[in-house]
Amino acid sequence: MRVGLLLEQVLSPVPGGTGRYAVEVAGALAATGGPGTEVTGWTAWHRRVAGAVVPGVGGPHRLPLPRRPLVAAWERGPLPAPRGVDLVHAPTPLAPLGGRRPVVVTVHDAVPWTHPETLTPRGVRWHRRMIGRAASSAAAVVVPTEAVARELRRHLTLRCPLVVVGEGVSGRLTLPSDALARQAALGLTPGGYLLTTATLEPRKGLDVLVGALAGAGAPDLPLVVVGQPGWGDVDVPALVAAAGLPAGRVRTLGRVPDEDLAALLGGATALVVPSRAEGFGLPVLEGMAAGVPVVTSDDPALVEVGGGSTVVTPVGDRVALAAALGRVAGDEQLRRDLVRRGRTRAADFSWTGAATRLWELYRELVPTGAG
């Protein structure tokens, strides 16, 4: 069986969690497919596509249109589409739907319906339209959690299977041998800072977290923010100033290499995920796997992934978040318990397991003997 995986998101200026998903799924599919299978990557036309190279995956092959014309074309129909494949998997709603070849579409969240205020009006319209097309024209829709599945069933009429396939933790996030040196180079002390990792956009709740740091009971620890700016003009220095915090209390590092992220996770007092809305919340899983206590909002997807192994506070509640951070930072036994439970919970997820389930789905959709 020949599977064409769309890797255009990997080349986006802000790949985000969906870009990591595409890379990890591609690599895991290539590693688990077995004899008679082939995975190839496909992108829009770019002069350079080296950023979308995934070990074990063919290509990436370039379609004949640049990104913007390709988006416009796929809003209307299935062409141009990957050639010489039996099935196409689109890891975002941008997909060549409507042709004869089966197309699987991953939908990462239901935010366009549940929290439209956290997207641009144009983004809401586009995602609703493309996810709606997937619901009616895809061979299957894949979602990362039961929470997303429930919302899609509530808001859409699905004419195809809706399949929940969890995510995993990148092997590149293994704690490096020079973790202490990497932390020191950033001016950080192991166990002496809080960490949050997310694309900087309104729904990630960074305003809530910064406000919580100024609240009663919050630990007197610096906050390290890892992630690229997204939409919405999230101005971290302005948030810090508005909260009355010293300028150095919050440090923004932007996007960092995986080795640095692993080192940052390994030294954090806690990983904080205060999102207003998520579909999976990959940082929660990454934190638990790294042996870091995790504090999240009570967004349904985050609670589902945490599986009772995180500290949960109400979405948007700065007072509760401040108190929770204070408890975690001040209670060594609680931290040990969270680490133990988190590692156990994280072991339930893997990219290998996700890829195995996806191959099962592909074989259900492609006629026997194809490829």
Report the location of each language-model feature.
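Carbohydrate transferase catalytic cores enriched for Leloir-type hexosyltransferases
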Residues: 1-371
